[in-house]
């Protein structure tokens, strides 16, 4: 995937910005005492709702507000500056925040369009931007040279974007999206040394690369601007282990410890819930393909880290059965997603002060 191509998650974000989604039929407005510091929602958490394309039309920001969320991750800001100003005013009146996903400039010819989008994001009052520039490394690449060439291309793209970010004082948060181990992402950002480029820390993604979530967080901590909060479950399967988002509080993460650490760094950090309701992901650590991009000292995966991860899997069987969506009707899948998001939101409010 090139740095400007759209992942499944970004396509959902695009749809979230374009499709008007209904409240649940039985939903009543949910209070949000934390306002814009309360938990927000990442676009990938709305996948079932977007696909359902229900008939009732409710603006996505209104949906999030009515459902008690403090922020929303969406695709592009309004291209018209008057509309951008209206969005900024609306966010202020609702006491909410927004995070946008904007394609980065793959070539110098793309800088003008990127500049216009960053200006629009700035005028909209964006909290920051997010970019997920990789797929799952162990699926995307079959050898180290191809992985490394992609990484170098991404570095060049971000360096090309940085002057425009600095011009408008808009921050870009790069998600740890199962593509880079945390030490190599941190080393890159240290070398780049820009206050405008940092990390959107996903609580669970780097388990797939044999890292403990707290290790990932600590390695990336100096650069974290925002977070995708989630809880994770793991269980063995024949080629490795399964990795699944589960309700907040039902997984293996020490959420309170992690939230406290992130808030200590930045009391105003934006937490967006990413409770993706889907089949568990297969992490095939016993296959040759998984290890194909880790056979070079520039990007190692030590055997010690594999052993620690397998021990984590062994010692943490799922507390409850992990979610499955295969065979569900669209209506049932939508209800399951709504229920999961609502339960996780309520847990975050009660136990994490979000």
Q: What do the PLM-derived regions correspond to, one by one?
A:
Residues 17, 22-29, 94-98, 105-198:
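Active-site acidic/histidine proton-transfer and metal-coordination neighborhood
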Residues 50-63, 110-119, 210-216:
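Short, acidic/polar
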Residues 31-34, 61-66, 81-99, 115-126, ...:
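Acidic (Asp/Glu)-rich catalytic clusters
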Residues 60, 117, 150, 154-161, ...:
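Alpha-helical packing segments of well-folded alpha/beta enzyme cores
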Residues 48-53, 74-84, 104-112, 139, ...:
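Acidic-and-aromatic substrate-binding clefts and catalytic sites of carbohydrate-active enzymes
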Residues 37-43, 72-74, 98-102, 129-131, ...:
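Hydrophobic faces of well-ordered beta-strands that scaffold small-molecule active sites
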Residues 58-78:
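Catalytic domains of carbohydrate-active enzymes, especially glycoside hydrolases
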Residues 3-5, 9-16, 20, 26-38, ...:
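Histidine-acidic metal/acid-base catalytic patches
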